[in-house]
Amino acid sequence: MQPLSILVLHGPNLNLLGKREPGVYGSTTLAEINSLLAEAALKLQAKVFPLQSNHEGVLVDAIHEALGKHQGILINAGAYTHTSVALRDAIAAVNLPTVEVHLSNIYRREDFRHHSYIAPVVIGQISGFGVQSYLLGLQGLVAHLKG
């Protein structure tokens, strides 16, 4: 059986994980998160393909290119969660099962972070568990895909 192919998208400023506001986002780097996801994916008979970009259009293009290439998407859109209709529309357009994750609990933060444009078009959202948000999101996505 072929492993499931999961696109993992990391949005703006996530390249600074480990340095940026460790009290909010923790001390784990993006490279470490990607490594943990790759390990977890192997155990779940899946493979992850991570991409980080600070540019909305790059993320939209990656979502479009996922069609026919990946079975699902795991996304931490960062600040674009609260601002990007383009990401929301791209996810809706490709209609691939997608899980939204956040390291911090976006509902315990500033009011403007309480709204997600992405949440209505994904199968689930996990926030507030630090690095575990990614791992739980991956588990949930794979379980959904395996039906």
UniProtKB/Swiss-Prot annotation:
Keywords: Amino-acid biosynthesis, Aromatic amino acid biosynthesis, Lyase. One of its GO terms (molecular function) is 3-dehydroquinate dehydratase activity. It catalyses: 3-dehydroquinate = 3-dehydroshikimate + H2O. The active site is at 25 (proton acceptor), 102 (proton donor). Substrate binds at residues 76, 82, 89, 103-104, 113. It comes from the Bacteria. InterPro entries: DHquinase_II, DHquinase_II_CS, DHquinase_II_sf. It holds the Pfam family DHquinase_II. Pathway: Metabolic intermediate biosynthesis; chorismate biosynthesis; chorismate from D-erythrose 4-phosphate and phosphoenolpyruvate: step 3/7. Coiled coil: none annotated. One of its GO terms (biological process) is chorismate biosynthetic process. The record marks 20 as: Transition state stabilizer. Its EC number is 4.2.1.10. Disulfide bonds: none annotated. PROSITE patterns: DEHYDROQUINASE_II. PANTHER family: CATABOLIC 3-DEHYDROQUINASE. Catalyzes a trans-dehydration via an enolate intermediate. Homododecamer. HAMAP family: AroQ (MF_00169). This is 3-dehydroquinate dehydratase. It comes from Nostoc sp. (strain PCC 7120 / SAG 25.82 / UTEX 2576).
